[in-house]
Amino acid sequence: MALNINKKNYRLADMSISPDESVPYPDPDETAEIIEDKIDMAECGTIWHVREWRGDDGLVEQFALMLNVTSAHPAYSRCQQLKGNQHNFDQVRRTDTWHSSVHSHQYFIDCEDCDREVHHELAGGREEEKSRRVVNGSFKKHYDGMLYTQFDYLERWKRGKP
């Protein structure tokens, strides 16, 4: 083999491999252990659903939180009216990481573009560790918001997105 006279480091690039920054954040592993909980908060007129997937280090890597309004909630008839004849008209808010982003679905809000609000884009590959921290932080924020300051959370929903 001839010597490399130019002293350059030639590397063959595999064009079939996408750049690292385009690697998507992984979807939840439905076969992995999932922590699920349902909390009936009758005094608030809500039912709160929690699903979380944790990594080996205890960080929440995926989550789904849903706050449902029951018929005991003062806003129930308004929710029913705004949602129409759909069977799931009592759903107020759901926050999850299903589609490579941390996002919120907000229903019944009288504002434009109220169905989805994107908070953070997530990435895999080199950026996955940073994305995991974003997911874990978002989980704590929404978890605490729904559990400890639920009335503030519902007021925000009634007013629309800030």
Which residues fall in each region the model found?
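Intrinsically disordered, low-complexity regions
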Residues: 2, 31-32, 36, 57, ...
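Negatively charged, low-complexity tracts enriched in Asp/Glu with abundant Ser/Thr
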Residues: 2-81
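Generic intrinsically disordered, low-complexity segments enriched for polar/acidic and small residues
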Residues: 7, 22, 60, 86, ...
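Glutamate identity and glutamate-enriched acidic tracts
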Residues: 21, 30-37, 43, 52, ...
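Acidic, aromatic-enriched beta-alpha/helix-loop junctions
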Residues: 62-115
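Acidic, low-complexity intrinsically disordered segments
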Residues: 111-161
